[in-house]
């Protein structure tokens, strides 16, 4: 990219969290001391929200035309735009919720805080998210996997493929579903396509593909993906709060319309 890319690994925990808390503290001080100034007033205004959302939409469209190797989502302009949107949301909430009333501000708080949590956890979590691939052969213990760069890394669990089953359509013999039965630290679990197994807080195992033996009759091994997302539940909390706020807003509008 023309403006360079950000090394997200630098912001891995706890640096990302510390920077987020420090940013909120600075915004709070700025709002308290200069909240009536022209710059802060404009930055938290609805017009600024429209500008930021329009720029984000344009960047998303432009990002679709950029080659994958350019890593548009980690480019300085795009990340800077998302940080500006987070700062805008924070200032809007600080200004609106100075005198909080549940009946008046509850829906507003849920929507805006939900969006903020989902965005921040997505950005901070990018540095802590790991996707590893491992090849499991029947009856063999595996305790290492490979990242996207091909580097071998240790797994937190030892896994063994016990058996594998492929379900086919009787009409044309095409694969409908495939399943794998594993031992994860001697605990049995079942994997299927789009049906992962959770092995810890924010860590899931996905079944990706399989390979047949030379005769093409039996499965000799399968490929699994171990995804470590420690910020996943914070993101889910943000989404739930956003949905709750939307429902709350709709109900409030309906009640006010009947009065």
What are these regions (language model features)?
Residues 1-259:
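Solvent-exposed, non-transmembrane regions of integral membrane proteins
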